[in-house]
Curated annotation (Swiss-Prot):
Component of the ubiquinol-cytochrome c reductase complex (complex III or cytochrome b-c1 complex) that is part of the mitochondrial respiratory chain. The b-c1 complex mediates electron transfer from ubiquinol to cytochrome c. Contributes to the generation of a proton gradient across the mitochondrial membrane that is then used for ATP synthesis. The cytochrome bc1 complex contains 11 subunits: 3 respiratory subunits (MT-CYB, CYC1 and UQCRFS1), 2 core proteins (UQCRC1 and UQCRC2) and 6 low-molecular weight proteins (UQCRH/QCR6, UQCRB/QCR7, UQCRQ/QCR8, UQCR10/QCR9, UQCR11/QCR10 and a cleavage product of UQCRFS1). This cytochrome bc1 complex then forms a dimer. The gene is MT-CYB. Its cofactor is heme b. It is a multi-pass membrane protein. Binds 2 heme b groups non-covalently. One of its GO terms (molecular function) is metal ion binding. It is found in: Mitochondrion inner membrane. This is Cytochrome b.
Length: 379
């Protein structure tokens, strides 16, 4: 008799995805982040569900309802901080996952890569809308500034912004619709993640060497289930250290002040995981130019596969590309730092230089290094 996990229509899908899945025998810990992102998503949906039971999406009571969750709801404080810091963990895993994809050439799976970019955009939209919900000062002004960027679109810009706001400023209608979207988008992310996995399993996983691993595969369970559980334990450890010891470390103190449309905070800035894109936006003096640069800073990932000039897939045996990759990482850290600084000298200049460096490395230097390394192989 056939094993039920191989014959049952539903269990068979799980079996082919997580148990009997043929996996390269040499994938490193950098391949853990996919499963960690899945765990983060489930954690965010669960904590978010419990928060939504007590939250009210009304400008008059939103701030009070979040305070009520922290003070009066059983374990409300831990649910709230797990949700807020869980988002930070989500983005740490996301950046690591995308970075691994770029380093090891996983972008050569075009469908998987493009759905990944779509997932990144959707997650960023979800996180932005979630940041507006507590209705603190930074929530309100962040929503005002970021939605206002759409007014840079010629001809339809102003009408589009007012349509999104549901009025002439960020108001009750805006908060209500942001809550509705923030609730539904994680489920769309879940569906996209399933499609992402579907396309990945069509081709099989990449591996650090970048070479085909058809001759050397091992079953996913128990080898990689155990390995993923180790990664999961470390993730939970980091998350709980944040939640229990310094829950407000990554937040903004201004968000503990209720939203006041008549009082602008001295420095309006988004959450830390958007600072690199915010720095690129601010580095261009023109409004439309800044918005385009902001979108392109993420959309540039879509052209990475087209700019691959090397005969090798990953960067494991490509020292020049490795140097450029880590320079790009350092540059992104610099942009993150600049995004949180006031708009004054020398930060403006540093931001502009870091933005130029960011686009130059990806669009110009990486393809050139690939060509140089191809020639070095002939020597």
């Amino acid at each position: 008799m056939t094993n039920i996990r191989k014959s049952h229509p539903l269990i068979k899908i799980v079996n082919e995805s997580f148990i009997d899945l043929p996996t390269p025998s040499n994938i490193s810990a950098w391949w853990n982040f996919g499963s960690l992102l899945g765990v983060c998503l489930v954690l965010q949906i669960l904590t978010g569900l419990f928060l939504a039971m007590h939250y009210t999406s009304d400008t008059a009571t939103a701030f009070s309802s979040v305070t009520h969750i922290c003070r009066d709801v059983n374990y409300g404080w831990i649910i709230r901080y797990m949700h807020a810091n869980g988002a930070s963990m989500f983005f740490i895993c996301l950046f690591m996952h995308v970075g691994r994809g770029m380093y090891y050439g996983s972008y050569t799976f075009p469908e998987t890569w493009n759905i990944g970019i779509l997932l990144l955009f959707t997650t960023m939209a979800t996180a932005f809308m979630g940041y507006v919900l507590p209705w603190g000062q930074m929530s309100f002004w962040g929503a005002t500034v970021i939605t206002n960027l759409l007014s840079a679109i010629p001809y339809i810009g102003t009408s589009l912004v007012e349509w999104i706001w549901g009025g002439f400023s960020v108001n009750k209608a805006t908060l209500t619709r942001f809550f509705a979207f923030h609730f539904i988008l994680p489920f769309i992310i879940l569906a996209l993640a399933a499609i992402h996995l579907l396309f990945l399993h069509e081709t099989g996983s990449n591996n650090p060497s970048g070479m085909t691993s058809d001759t050397d595969k091992i079953p996913f369970h128990p080898y990689y289930t155990i390995k993923d559980i180790l990664g999961l334990l470390l993730l939970i450890l980091m998350l709980m250290l944040l939640v229990l010891f310094s829950p407000d470390l990554l937040g903004d103190p201004d968000n503990y002040t209720p939203a006041n449309p008549l009082n602008t905070p001295p420095h309006i800035k988004p959450e830390w995981y958007f600072l690199f894109a915010y720095a690129i936006l601010r580095s261009i003096p023109n409004k439309l130019g800044g918005v385009l640069a902001l979108i392109l800073s993420i959309l540039i990932l879509a052209v990475v596969p087209l700019l691959h000039t090397s005969k090798q897939r990953g960067m494991m045996f490509r020292p020049i590309s490795q140097c450029l990759f880590w320079l790009l990482v350092a540059d992104l850290l610099a942009l993150t730092w600049i995004g949180g600084q006031p708009v004054e000298y020398p930060f403006i200049t540093i931001g502009q230089l870091a933005s130029i460096t960011y686009f130059s490395i990806i669009l110009i230097l990486m393809p050139i290094s690939g060509i140089i390394e191809n020639h070095l192989l002939k020597w």
